[in-house]
Design a protein with these regions (language model features):
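RNA pseudouridine synthases
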Residues: 1-151
């Protein structure tokens, strides 16, 4: 199984993020160069290649809105340090509770509204397509968005 997780493109990971602004356009592929600052435990996104930067790519699409927040589904094409947080912040979309990447205040529990929603892969022996969907956290906002996912 470990080999499967290391192979490029053999696994599809999707995440849900609750953000402060509605994205325009409603879906897009983002490509940035990420520079990791070890001391700050933070990554910075740039549009052009930088020294010691790693290319990062993700696709997002808008799913739904509450009165103040917006739900995005994100598919990672690369797996970089704080990639989703850094890339969304670079286009003005801040994840609820994420002070490090620009959201205005923390969540009461100290967490952020970023959820590993699903993983899809082909079983290495049976070749069966496996899809695992993680339930959303016990939180009213997550519960709201789960109900409105297909609305």
């Amino acid at each position: 199984m470990n080999e499967l997780f290391r192979m490029d493109g053999s696994i599809r990971k999707t995440y849900w993020a609750v953000v402060d602004n509605k994205p325009e356009p409603s879906e897009a592929t983002l490509e940035h160069w990420l520079v990791r600052n070890e001391k700050q435990n933070k990554s910075y996104a740039f549009l052009k290649e930088q020294k010691e930067a790693k290319k990062a790519s993700l696709a997002y699409h808008y799913i739904a809105s509450s009165d103040r927040f917006h739900l995005l589904e994100i598919e990672l094409h690369t797996g970089r340090h704080h990639q989703i947080r850094a890339q969304l912040a670079a286009i003005g979309l801040h994840i609820k509770g994420d002070l490090k990447y620009g959201f205005s205040r923390s969540n009461k529990d100290g967490g952020i509204h970023l959820h590993a929603r699903s993983i899809i892969f082909t079983h290495p022996v049976t070749q069966e397509l496996i899809k695992i969907i993680a339930p959303v956290p016990e939180d009213p906002l997550w519960q709201f968005f789960e109900k409105h996912e297909n609305a």
